[in-house]
């Protein structure tokens, strides 16, 4: 970890990050966790519109995230970094965001079974795990298993800004559990300088390789 700290300052020093996060691709030019999220949301919207560049770009459809009152990140909210990329539901005339249901006896623990029902109903294009107030692990593996079994096309992202220094056996290994994208800041539980990072679990042969190329651009 000391060696990683000494090399993380340079934008080209992505190898230690790939080893630490356990993913094949990392972007380190972003300067904060919020910028990491903005770059990811922008890339997702651009990738969604990749086959039609003649018309007004469509924004992201439904997004599933943690409610800010339950510890969710501000940058993952419609009033945060997500605001320029999220669609408006034409029926409700509200932003197309739904929140993870929580357990009645633990308001900071996601109710997995109820979440499955929400996903089945709204078919979110993006699922954002992660909180600024973390008391429990996020059920990444359980939700990945469900969307795979139900063949629901979505992208699973984990904003680890506040827990990036806890990646590993004692907390969570997001990519092993099924996350596709991990964002974070390097100056909270991870003891680095003021920077951001984006890691993805995409390879050249994957359908979403183009999404990674868009994130890089």
Task: Give the label of every model feature segment.
Residues 5-26, 31-217:
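Conserved PLP-enzyme active-site core in the AAT-like
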């Amino acid at each position: 970890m000391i060696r990683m700290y000494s090399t993380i300052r340079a934008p080209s020093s992505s190898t230690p990050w790939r080893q630490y996060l356990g993913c094949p691709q990392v972007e380190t030019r972003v300067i904060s966790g919020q910028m990491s999220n903005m770059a990811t949301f922008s890339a997702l919207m651009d990738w969604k519109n990749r086959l039609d560049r003649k018309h007004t770009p469509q924004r992201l459809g439904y997004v599933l995230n943690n409610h800010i009152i339950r510890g969710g990140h501000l940058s993952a909210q419609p009033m945060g970094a997500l605001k320029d990329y999220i669609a408006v539901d034409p029926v409700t005339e509200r932003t197309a965001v739904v929140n993870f249901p929580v357990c009645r006896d633990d308001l900071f623990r996601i109710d997995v079974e109820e979440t499955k029902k929400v996903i089945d109903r709204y078919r979110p294009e993006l699922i954002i795990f992660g909180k600024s107030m973390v008391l429990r692990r996020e059920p990444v593996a359980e939700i990945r298993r469900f969307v795979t079994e139900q063949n629901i096309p979505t992208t699973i992202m984990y904003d680890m800004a506040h827990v990036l220094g806890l990646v590993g056996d004692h907390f969570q290994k997001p990519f092993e559990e099924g996350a596709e994208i991990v964002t974070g800041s390097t100056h909270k539980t991870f003891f680095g300088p003021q920077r951001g990072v984006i890691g993805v679990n995409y390879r050249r042969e994957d359908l979403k390789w183009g999404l990674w190329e868009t994130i890089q651009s």
